[in-house]
């Protein structure tokens, strides 16, 4: 099977997650976090609006399948979409002054929908993990899971060497 590479400057592992098969099928990925472990995945709450991301028990469900696509015009950033909300919705950081609330929103050319996926080099214990950073919030802030005992709420927080910011990206089942 032939693959078209979406971008070549990322590590080989991430590039393979961005590839599109020759038959037009887009690869779908699962995001898991070190804090929540292998049994929880990045998901969308099915609340009628289908717009709030959360960490939920992993399953073979559309809200946990994510498509990573190069963001135009700036291809060093990516958009994160899930088939559950449709091709016209992207993971977005709300530009509300606090800039820490995440929603699925109509895809547009806004910095809150552009993500960089950076190997977690500063966390040597998390080899093979990534930090998810957003253009709106800057490269010193990361997607984080709030350690509140339930470990399912997401926020944008100052990047630090914490397990809630280390993401494993695997091919979805």
Task: Please identify what each model-predicted range represents.
Residues 10-17:
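Bacterial N-terminal signal peptides
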Residues 24-173:
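Lectin-like carbohydrate-binding module/patch detector with strong preference for beta-trefoil
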Residues 1-9:
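Bacterial N-terminal signal peptides that target proteins for export
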Residues 17-24:
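N-terminal signal peptide
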């Amino acid at each position: 099977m032939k693959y078209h590479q979406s971008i070549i400057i990322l590590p080989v592992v991430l590039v393979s997650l961005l590839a599109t098969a020759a038959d037009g099928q887009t690869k779908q990925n699962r995001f898991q976090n070190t804090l929540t472990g292998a049994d929880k995945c990045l998901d969308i709450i099915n609340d009628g609006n289908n717009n709030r991301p959360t960490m939920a028990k992993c399953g073979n469900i559309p809200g946990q399948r994510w498509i990573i696509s190069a963001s135009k015009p700036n291809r060093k950033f990516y958009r994160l979409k899930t088939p559950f909300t449709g091709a016209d919705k992207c993971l977005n950081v709300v530009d509300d002054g606090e800039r820490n609330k995440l929603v699925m929103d109509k895809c547009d050319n806004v910095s809150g929908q552009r993500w960089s996926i950076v190997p977690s080099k500063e966390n040597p214990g998390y080899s093979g993990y990534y930090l998810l950073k957003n253009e709106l919030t800057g490269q010193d802030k990361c997607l984080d899971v709030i350690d509140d005992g339930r470990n399912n709420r997401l926020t944008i927080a100052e990047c630090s060497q914490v397990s809630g910011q280390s993401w494993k990206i695997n091919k979805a089942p």
